[in-house]
Amino acid sequence: MTSTPKPLVLIILDGFGHSDIPEHNAIFAANKPVYDRLCATQPHGLISGSGMDVGLPDGQMGNSEVGHMNLGAGRVVYQDFTRVTKAIRDGEFFENPVLTGAVDKAVGAGKAVHILGLLSDGGVHSHQDHLVAMAELAAQRGAEKIYLHAFLDGRDTPPRSAQSSIELLDATFAKLGKGRIASLIGRYYAMDRDNRWDRVSAAYNLIVDSAAEYTADTALAGLEAAYARDESDEFVKATRIGEAVKVEDGDAVIFMNFRADRARELSRAFVEPDFTEFARARLPKMAAYIGLTQYSAKIPAPAAFAPSSLNNVLGEYLAKNGKTQLRIAETEKYAHVTFFFSGGREEPFEGEERILIPSPKVATYDLQPEMSAPEVTDRIVEAIEQQRFDVIVVNYANGDMVGHTGVFEAAVKAVEALDTCVGRIVDALDKVGGEALITADHGNVEQMEDECTGQAHTAHTTEPVPFIYVGKRNVKVREGGVLADVAPTMLKLLGLEKPVEMTGTSILVDA
């Protein structure tokens, strides 16, 4: 007879880093009796979630996709950002057959190359250096008409920081002697991931038909006008730059974001023949629509950089060992706790169940800082009490999503809501003899103001993240841990040998 599972719960507090600086630190300011008690009574420490420790360039802040990939893989996963940057440096990028093939088709027919992407040095969804390289590639291969449709950031970068990025691309086009920025729009519209199709349609119509709320002679003038309307980068409304540019039949369209989750909705509008989420005024017969990476196996668009496969990630290895698992999150982070945590796999593993709790329908999450955390917690407590699962993996979105708003008071409320939820999980586990690991994927909410500019700090950080063991074992947290060490730690607690593919090592050692 098999023993009843007493679940091991991995609690991922998204965007919940650690900083010893109390100023503008929502975690420090929050009333969080549960978290404080756990830190005082349970084995705890800090682990790294940024830079080379997660497969990103040195000094690069972590993000949710990267964090969950590393958490689930049990090894450092070298990220698409790093792969693309290396290919540009090595020159391989300029010979990439998917990119060159798309450009050559357009050039051969005397047509245009349209480059879409987040124009930012944030490095979370894209990097401006990649957009520069794409413009250079198009020019090298003879494209005369090169148009950049720039999505502005202000979320993974300071809220009003797009000027330098626009100047970089303007200078690039001037140096090439061809090409220009054709449109501006905030990522709030172009990069939605919560089925707000009215936002996506504004971006689609701007790119395809140059349908804009505002026009400007230059991109910098368009940005200045948006700031005058009190629109920060993320929220810049559809702005046509210069003469109208449309996506015509035979043009090539290349989406230069390397992160998938916020590239899917707009891509679907471009490539799905039976798309019904909004009425497309026109669907051009493009020579090619390319994604820099694979945005989804279900989206029919070639990827310039195909996904690298990861074998024996935590979910797969649990399934092979007959263990049951539950993945749960609200909409904003559901892809992270499923697709990314599973190493880029869409389908559940055998014995894996998933629960999606809808995120609240508010314009920005400072308006509802608790988000759907109470509802997520209801379902977790229920699952713990049922004792059906060996492992439960939950993501709480609040620290990251409310942190991104830059509203300090709301961020404090988000942390306090999380504290209540964690307390409910710990109490439920105590009743059944379960255990938990509490950690985060990257920092955010611990720094809510930019100390240099005084602006709201809406981006992620490079701070370490907490790691707390909740249970009865006599263990301690070793130093030097990284996100890739979390899965091997879980396997050790479950009494399973880690697979050879997992190069991480347990963060917990005997006390």
Swiss-Prot record:
It catalyses: (2R)-2-phosphoglycerate = (2R)-3-phosphoglycerate. Its cofactor is Mn(2+). Substrate binds at H125, R155, D156, R187, R193, R259, A260, D261, R262, K333. One of its GO terms (biological process) is glucose catabolic process. The keyword Transferase does not apply. Pathway: Carbohydrate degradation; glycolysis; pyruvate from D-glyceraldehyde 3-phosphate: step 3/5. Mn(2+) 1 binds at D400, H404, H460. The keyword Hydrolase does not apply. Its EC number is 5.4.2.12. Keywords: Glycolysis, Isomerase, Manganese, Metal-binding. The active site is at S64. It holds the Pfam family iPGM_N. InterPro entries: Alkaline_phosphatase_core_sf (IPR017850), BPG-indep_PGM_N (IPR011258), Metalloenzyme (IPR006124), PGAM_B_sf (IPR036646), Pgm_bpd_ind (IPR005995). It is an enzyme of class 5 (isomerase). CDD domains: iPGM. GO terms for molecular function: manganese ion binding; phosphoglycerate mutase activity. HAMAP family: GpmI. NCBIfam families: pgm_bpd_ind (TIGR01307). This is 2,3-bisphosphoglycerate-independent phosphoglycerate mutase. It comes from Pseudomonas putida (strain ATCC 47054 / DSM 6125 / CFBP 8728 / NCIMB 11950 / KT2440).
